[in-house]
Amino acid sequence: MNSKKYILIILLTINFSCNMSQKNNDGVIYASIETNKGIIKTELFFNQTPVTVANFISLAEGNNKEVSDQYKGKKYYNGLTFHRVIPDFMIQGGDPTGTGSGSPGYNFKDEFVNELKHDSPGTLSMANAGPGTNGSQFFITHKETPWLDGGHTVFGKVLEGQDVVDKIEQGDSIVNVEIIRDGSGAKRFNAAKVFTNHFKEEEKLKKDAEKKLLKLKEDVSKIHNKLKSEANETETGLKYFINEKGDGDKVDESKVILTHYAVYFEDGNLLDTSILKVAEKYDMFDNRRAQGGGYSPIEAKVGPKDMMIQGFKEGLKILNIGDKATLFLPYYLAYGETESRGIPAKSNLIFEVEIVDQK
């Protein structure tokens, strides 16, 4: 055998062995969920979703330091019920009130991992009321539920006892949750510490993000002020600036206009956008919106009877396909003198738009 090939094979073998060894050293963490119908044995993905698993384990073992005082030092899940059961969908538990609205006294972040999907029966996942609202409630699926991907954190899977999952009825109880650690990495995983540290890290990230956002808003506001000083003005008081001229036909008010937009307050604060990069820059990315195709051009109708804000319609009708423009709407061409949809009364708005097409 050629010596170079031999060396390459040896190196690949060593590398593969090291990877396998590292994986074995990480170990596995199991949760044995004893119910009144039998035992459900699950694996917890502590490497991929460490915060979510740390939350579950520390609640189960009674050493979670973030819970409300009434739950401290108690094995949180013991004695709770499966308060929500939907046949051929899932079983849900972990609510101390049994109503679906209870919590341990805090919320924490989502941990979405591309490789972890709701792609089979026995998926263990977090229930929530929207982004960043995880608490103690979890569910286990009866079947694959792909529409939940990107909205709920998958943090484990059923290894044994799927038949028990399928027998659970509303009101059935969790008798005990036992956490089993197998392997050195699993035994080193300090759930209570990991979970508490997560809040400290999140607080630091939040402060850093606030500083970054403040600078971004100031920069955007300066740009808008400069453009406004150079903008054209219509008889109604709308001002517009063409950032980039397209070469398409003029917008036809009888057609549906496909347009990207980002709408801002005058201080540079972003209200809403269809543009993914802008949402990410402002830390306003919504995974559920992305899953539903929400970062795509909207369909706008700009005829006289169409229900869109007046200044937005007027601004689009000035433009051609391919144009990128900034529209400055005085409050009376936007949402008017009263508060609307969380927008303060008499708010002047700024739209950045791109006319993509019309049909």
Give the role of each language-model region.
Residues C18-K359:
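Cross-family detector of peptidyl-prolyl cis-trans isomerase
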Residues M1-V28:
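Bacterial Sec-dependent N-terminal signal peptides
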